[in-house]
């Protein structure tokens, strides 16, 4: 993930993007929905397997690894939706972000958080993804 865009309007104006991992954050539900729809615009949602994970669950690492490694019997592609509701980071969440960042997968990964501030995202989370 070499090019990071934190402006939703710039992202929504993009016609093509090559990234497979998206961090969607903010407190405006309508913009979150628009950003998700834009990231999924090129996908036929009837033909993808959807996996929903909660980053705060104790077995997140195991579930995430299973999601990216398992093959679907019926679908070619997989979209992994990851939700984070906490408003602050801890070492387990940072480890989870590192796990996601280091994952080498063709699956589309959408991480959604509404409670973590932009300051924390810019300072603590984006550098994790920039290093990979």
Regions found by a protein language model. Give the residues of each.
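Phosphate-binding P-loop
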Residues: 13-18
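Non-catalytic interfacial helical region
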Residues: 1-9, 29-132
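Short hydrophobic/aromatic beta-strand immediately N-terminal to the Walker A/P-loop
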Residues: 21-25, 81
């Amino acid at each position: 993930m070499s090019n990071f865009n934190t402006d939703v309007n710039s992202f929504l104006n993009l016609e093509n993007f090559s990234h497979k991992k998206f961090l969607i954050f903010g407190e405006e539900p309508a913009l979150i929905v628009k950003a998700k729809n834009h990231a999924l615009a090129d996908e036929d949602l009837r033909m993808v397997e959807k996996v929903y994970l909660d980053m705060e669950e104790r077995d997140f690492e195991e579930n995430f690894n299973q999601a990216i490694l398992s093959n679907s019997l019926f679908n070619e592609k997989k979209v992994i939706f990851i939700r984070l509701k906490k408003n602050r980071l801890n070492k387990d969440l940072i480890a989870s972000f590192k796990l996601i960042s280091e994952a080498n997968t063709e699956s589309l990964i959408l991480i959604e958080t509404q409670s973590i501030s932009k300051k924390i995202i810019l300072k603590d989370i984006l550098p994790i993804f920039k290093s990979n």
